[in-house]
């Protein structure tokens, strides 16, 4: 499945997270783990390609994100839990559109490795302004809190997100993507 992902996000303080958690109390949290993939040299990042395997309780997903003028084009392959778990060990790519795109873009599949993982406990539901997710993320020695809103219309979505934050007394705090925050911990560890 492919789609254009347009989302807005903000980091949250623990207090802001706890306040919003009350709005999401009707939603059962789901724990998912993202395994981030690149070469040791960062070839994927230099080509502006972002690749992950996500494991969830009921299935797994292989996802490739490619930045567009607005949002990211997202390519997804759904797999069962066993396939996803096996892929986190072997990185043996199924024949799929993602594999084809990587090869077309000159990525040497044998050089890819899993850099590490980030685990998210997510409460997600469809609101009247878009698909909203309240996340707790744990990676390396860090824990952060985040609110995301996925929308179809970039301009209206931005206005709706800003209004939601104001209505709920949330101060906007710029949030890099999860993969960027994760990779920043790798760079810090090297210093």
Feature map (PLM): residue ranges:
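Phosphate-end processing signature that detects enzymes handling 5′-triphosphorylated RNA
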Residues: 1-191
């Amino acid at each position: 499945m492919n789609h254009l992902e347009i989302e807005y996000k903000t980091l949250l303080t623990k207090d802001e997270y706890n306040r919003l958690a009350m709005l999401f109390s009707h939603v059962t949290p789901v724990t998912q783990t993202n395994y981030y993939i690149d070469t040791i040299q960062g070839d994927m990042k230099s080509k502006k390609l972002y690749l992950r395997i996500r494991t969830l309780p009921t299935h797994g997903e292989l996802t490739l994100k490619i930045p567009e003028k607005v949002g990211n084009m997202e390519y997804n392959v759904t797999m069962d839990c066993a396939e996803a778990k096996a892929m986190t060990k072997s990185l043996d790519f199924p024949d799929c559109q993602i594999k084809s795109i990587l090869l077309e873009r000159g990525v040497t599949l044998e050089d890819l490795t899993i850099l590490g993982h980030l685990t998210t406990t997510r409460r997600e539901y469809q609101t009247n302004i878009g698909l909203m997710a309240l996340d707790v993320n744990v990676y390396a020695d860090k824990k952060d809190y985040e609110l995301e809103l996925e929308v179809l219309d970039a301009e209206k979505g931005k206005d709706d997100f800003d209004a939601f934050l104001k209505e709920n007394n949330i101060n906007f705090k710029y949030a890099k993507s999860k993969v960027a925050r994760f990779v920043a911990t790798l760079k810090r560890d090297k210093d």
